Amino acid sequence: MATVKVIDFIQTPFDFLIVGGGTAGLVLAARLSEEPGIQVGVIEAGSLRLGDPKVDLPTGPGQMLGDPGYDWNFESIPQAGANAKAYHIPRGRMLGGSSGINFMSYNRPSAEDIDDWANKLGVKGWTWSELLPYFKRSENLEPIEPSASCPVSPKVHGTGGPIHTSIGPWQAPIEESLLAAFDEAARLQRPAEPYSGAHLGFYRSLFTLDRTSTPVRSYAVSGYYAPVMGRPNLKVLENAQVCRILLSDASDGIPVAEGVELHHAGARYAVSARREVILSAGSVQSPQLLELSGIGDPSVLEGAGIACRVANTDVGSNLQEHTMSAVSYECADGIMSVDSLFKDPALLEEHQSLYAKNHSGALSGSVSLMGFTPYSSLSTETQVDATMARIFDAPSVSGRLSQQNASYQRRQQEAVAARMQNRWSADIQFIGTPAYFNTAAGYASCAKIMSGPPVGYSACYSIVVSNMYPLSRGSVHVRTSNPMDAPAIDPGFLSHPVDVDVLAAGIVFADRVFRSTLLNGKVRRRVSPPAGLDLSNMDEARQFVRNHIVPYHHALGTCAMGQVVDEKLRVKGVRRLRVVDASVMPMQVSAAIMATVYAIAERASDIIKKDCGFGRRLRAHI
């Protein structure tokens, strides 16, 4: 049913309690409540914002990021690898979670990324072939025009799932020439099907945009929750924050998750679960809740004044995040980008009218062009050799690794090293962005990343660069025993020098694309990095990167499979407790992670149903 009052919620005899009604949590809620005899409860700290134009419209993210009504608005500790800056760490605070505030990019990783979870890290049962049916089950691909430069195959896409995917209706005029310039500079063929597990090359990307009528965001609320909110066995409590998991001891001394304690409207309540508690609070708050409940590194717990119930030094460690930098050029006269709307009120009015009349124009969706290249193809053999030597011998990360499982970290490093020497590996992502990409202001406030061109410049276009397989590792840990206190978030940005090498190589390549003769007459001059910075000097390129990155908002790994949870996503050393969200992903992937999180949650729902004896419904959904 729709969201309920707290008294109704706490008096319900739930079978499953899902902590967090975000990207993964609402998938689980919808799938588990398919069993009519099962009571499912969802606890969400934010509000239901169904029909909110800030959420629905493609231009909405800039209005939501940093707004506490939509965003947890976390901040990292100062980052030593990025000139001691403290970074804005946005996380969706609403039903739908970050699927409701992100930029709607729908990517799938390379098949190798997922296969490495099993083959390199020993997480059995999680391979590309086993996860692909769940990518398809979550997706509703809308018809793609043949001219869209995004080849799709029905074999790898779903057309009846909850989440709509489509090509945005607007493309910046420069992008056809830019796509050709990418092809020329990279000397790569365009991918035959970029969602099949092989996405090297450049193409127009899908987005979670529902274009069946007015183009609106398709996210966990609209796709998974809204169609089933009338179910009597599904209850959602909004504006309630879980404080800790309630644990009891079985006769063998192993703790059992009995329910949770929550805070709502100034009061605390306990609510129980007869079968399982499932954490879907995300990569920041799932490990925080484990630690608040006494599950984690004993030294961390002791420092926060929390009694240790289950010792696991991996809880909250292994944090991995993509970082982004960018090259921006000023467009030539007559070449429009989204920046043009900031400079010309009449043009803005024209595009507002286009959106109102037929849902077209620059306000209907602005980012479409992207691609992936290997690191080895952008660097000399000498540079690649030097990078390889630094992977396993980097003093700047030795302190971080000492508190984590050394063997586990070594296997991750070996996997990255193998990819970076592979000429078919999608090591670096490039995103065509029809606006000035302001890393100088965006690190402290993500809402300012695309807020118009700098003074003295007309409309700009940017190529955003991201390292897909970072070696830097960070952590999320409680500071105190108070659940209302934000945890200490240390992403470890650029703490490994190889990450700087990779981003610098990407910046140099992006600049080369802009200088292609195919863009003559379309771009005028470089805005960032400044014209005086010599990108032929890799030391200068590295220095630029260290001062000009922002997070991509793809944090994962803090409750990793194999370390904190097992292959069925059960928390080690505890009964009736699972984690299902991005935190269980053991290693970073070459994609925005939303599609993978949907797939993981879909698969988790089948695992849980099978474990609980509900197997009769499984085959109907694959």
From Swiss-Prot:
Effect of gene knockout: Leads to complete absence of citrinin production.
One Gene Ontology molecular-function label: oxidoreductase activity, acting on CH-OH group of donors
Enzyme Commission designation: 1.1.-.-
Domain of life: Eukaryota
One protein family per Pfam: GMC_oxred_N
Cofactor(s), by name: FAD
Key words of the record: FAD, Flavoprotein, Oxidoreductase
Pathway info: Mycotoxin biosynthesis
One example of a Gene Ontology biological process annotation: secondary metabolite biosynthetic process
Active-site residues (renumbered): 554
Residues that coordinate or bind FAD: 23-24, 44-45, 102-105, 582, 593-594
Function: Non-reducing polyketide synthase; part of the gene cluster that mediates the biosynthesis of the mycotoxin citrinin, a hepato-nephrotoxic compound to humans due to inhibition of respiration complex III. The pathway begins with the synthesis of a keto-aldehyde intermediate by the citrinin PKS (pksCT also named citS) from successive condensations of 4 malonyl-CoA units, presumably with a simple acetyl-CoA starter unit. Release of the keto-aldehyde intermediate is consistent with the presence of the C-terminal reductive release domain.
Family to which the UniProt record says this protein belongs: Belongs to the GMC oxidoreductase family.
Assembly description: Homodimer.
Protein name in the entry: Dehydrogenase citC
